[in-house]
């Protein structure tokens, strides 16, 4: 799916037209040299930010974890993001990418305390991937080689990139990551299994990203009276599961139909997955008419 970037972006508090101006960052910007920063991605439906409060809560928590002091309040950032959306006259479905880095200084692992952070946001058109949600994806299994603070939405994504490109060359769309015998999540998504009508997912600790869509799906499951367990589970439990799926902000809920060379379960999305997708769809429809 080809992404289409919109012209107007947010850059350090300004709304800038990239056709007229190309914002620049310093050569010794720590985000550029060290990956010293945080990012966030949130969804837009019909031009309206979805679950923005939850995304920004995580954004600020991640900044707090790395002791990066934001040059804005949450309210100021919300206003700037809305200005960017309005300036683009964006009324479609899409994603907003938001990033902040610590700032520029002479290269040193020890950062200065009074740096001026660099931040920006941009919009990308991205229709809902309905076909993927219906047909499902082929996945494989990989060792989780990431660091031990995966709950921080850091710019440092090199392990994810290495795994994602490896499996892409093999024809897979996502990987089930395993750390010391425990299934954690995917390269860019959270992971769930279903067994005996029970939803099971790794607990929200330091070994996974505390996904907003993950949180939302758990909420929907409880509203549907589907039992949810947040616990560690093994790869063997995955193979023996009735259903499994990934969740991510841009992709919502996408079922697994094949693991490695073998068909998984029925080879189609299961009834619990369908039920959760329907509930998610209904919630989006309600969001569109009430916001």
Task: Give the ranges of each region predicted by the language model.
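Ordered, amphipathic secondary-structure segments that act as subunit-interaction surfaces
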Residues: 87-100
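Helix-start/capping segments and mature chain N-termini
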Residues: 1-83, 87, 106, 110-291
